[in-house]
Amino acid sequence: QSKYYGIQVVVGEATQKQVDGFAFLELDLICVLGKQKPELVFGLLGGSELLQQPHFTTLLENHHRMLSHYRHQEWEEAMAELESCRLVSREVMGCPALSGLYLLYQQRIEEFVKTPPGPGWDGVYFAESK
């Protein structure tokens, strides 16, 4: 999944919770091929030095708001937060490029604006491959 998100290291929620002192960013709520239950996945972006940067804290807050709007089908708000994330992520020293991740969400949002997922959608992305 790392290639899909443009992040070198992608881990599940259980792994993310067991590791302290590293900078993680929630990437998606995903249901992989062959599984029934969706799982939160996270990208490992760096170590403790990244966690201590004020811009990284701002990025986490903006990213969380973007995902919340996305999962509530608030497309305009999600897109606005996405743009904020793009800007802030460039200010975070030592943070890997997140342009691929935000392009992915931009494309999903644009598609959902054209073809809404429906009122029962819970924000889960169904991966077509493992």
Describe every region a protein language model picked out:
Residues 117-130:
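Intrinsically disordered, low-complexity, charge-biased linker/tail regions
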Residues 2-77, 81-114, 118:
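Cytosolic regulatory/linker segments at or just downstream of nucleotide-handling modules
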